[in-house]
Amino acid sequence: ALYPQVKMVCQMELTSHLLTTAAYGTMKNSENELAEQLIEQTGDNTLTLMDKGYYSPGLLNTWSLAGEHRHWMIPLRKGAQYEEIRKLGKGDHLVKLNISPQARKKWPGLGNEVTARLLTVTRKGKVCHLLTSMTDAIRFPGTYTGADARSCKYGTTSE
């Protein structure tokens, strides 16, 4: 390009739309690399809604382990590989995400699998599949997880 370009990833508080933190780099940086920089600025006791483009078990696992009750929710990516561990309720499953050798190389502490929760919700006639780190079904009942239209906006849908 004939002019400077910057790639930027921002974190926004959902109700006020105020930006809480941002990371930027060159066009050579991936958005996931920039999102990694937001981990330390993310507060405890939060739920971060992510676009499906940020699907990376290493990033998501690191995000939730970086503090107290730092949860994430992300639309299930088409073709994502998972194994159902058990059913928690209607449209609510505990799943195991298998980790690729490439991801284990990039994230050495990751291990062979990550446990997550798969929620299936219907909004305006569309079925949305959402992954979240809120695996405790007693503390976070399916109706309380925040799985709403905002979460489904960029999600995997089916009729």
State where each predicted segment sits.
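Single, function-defining residue in the core of a domain
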Residues: 2-159
